[in-house]
Amino acid sequence: MEILKGRRVLRGKVIEEARRWASNLPFKSSVILIGSYARGDFNLWSDVDIVLIAELQENPLERLKSIDHPPGYEVIPLTPKEFLTLLRKRNPIAVEAMSNGIILRDDYNVKKLLKHEMKPP
């Protein structure tokens, strides 16, 4: 029982740290925690998977360089248009965001978009 409680506490701390990081971003963005910490099946070697939706530079390498994130974070930077395209194509990242994602910040109203775009055909 103590192990489960410890895992819940650790997960809660990671989510709050990610939420704090997201709230401190100096630009309009929506941030979704995905992956093992969102699902609750993380382990000692898990990273913190984040989908970052914002108006970003065109070059993917420049995007990554421009985002200051804590060690252990795996940030997937997308523009709103790119994210919408992934949703419509049922891309695994978008499906993960819809089914298990935890929205940490939502300047682009992604929550509404997720409900609308991910309805069954």
How should these model regions be labeled?
Residues 1-30, 38-45, 54-121:
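Catalytic core of pol beta-like nucleotidyltransferases
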Residues 51:
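A short, conserved beta-strand element in the Rossmann-like catalytic core
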